Amino acid sequence: MARSKVTDVPMALAVKIELFKRGCFDFITVKDGLKHEKQEHALKILTDNEHVELLYGGAAVGAKSWTGAVWLLFMCLCYPGSKWFIGRAELKRITQSTLITFYKVCNQYGVDDTLYKYNGQYNYIEFFNGSRIDLLDLQYKPGDPLYERYGSIEYTGGWIEEGGEVNFGAYDTLKTRIGRHLNNELGLRRKLFITCNPKKNWMYDTFYKPDKKGELPEYMYYLACLVQENPFIDPDYIEGLKTTKDKVKRERLLKGNWEYDDNPNALCSHDAICEIFGNKISIKTGTNYITGDIARF
């Protein structure tokens, strides 16, 4: 239900809302004469009429969480009655991290707590104009492998935070739930925003590999952003990443390397394992093989 009391939006905020609707994002992406070009690019994709799914990330500290929070905040302010979600592998990670970022974003752009209310009992943020953001627990549950608990909820769009922690089933279900709430009335394309660090899971197979091959469908977009491309980051943080002794962590978070190997002693690569189910040689010859470590049984 929308909040019934009449609330006046401060003039300074009203100007920002209008700028956002017009696609002018400098008040977000520019600071001290420097512009976060990748963040600008992400916001343009998130507000265009061409793309549906955006995977943004590829390394640590690319302003991914800030971008997600500011996008949802201003979409709610710009489009009364719209309905969105933020989903993470565990709800407590939203309340302990993502929600804190959301509050910082509100403070940064002059959105005080008279304009929205957080309901901690039912886990949603409701705005004065009837817009709403649901906070979703995307943890995999054996009793609900298809995420049917979200199968009948309708959203305008949404954001999956830290996609590397999230099960494919959550992504596969939620992308069918967007574009279902006032999109036609508000003139909005359905949008699913996914932020991440490199991880060899469904993001690697669904976004990164097809993009690398030039085969990513036109409605999908992968936007890589390395830590060095964030002009607002403390240089000392980058130096800290460079000194880590964990090679995999350094490759993922500093270099944005998706091709890293979790286990250098692995007998089979990730790609080889994924190709088991569509191996052209087995299809051609009709011969299949299976191996087993019998000593373990």
Predicted region positions:
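Pre-P-loop entry segment of helicase/translocase ATPase cores
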Residues: 1-53
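Walker A (P-loop) phosphate-binding loop of P-loop NTPases
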Residues: 61-62
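Walker A/P-loop NTP-binding motif
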Residues: 65-80
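Conserved Walker A/P-loop ATP-binding site and its immediately adjacent core
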Residues: 82-102
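Inter-Walker segment of RecA-like/P-loop motor cores
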Residues: 95-156
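Walker B catalytic acidic pair
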Residues: 161-162
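ASCE P-loop NTPase helicase motor core
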Residues: 165-236, 240, 244
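ATPase catalytic-site recognition across NTP-hydrolyzing enzymes
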Residues: 230-295
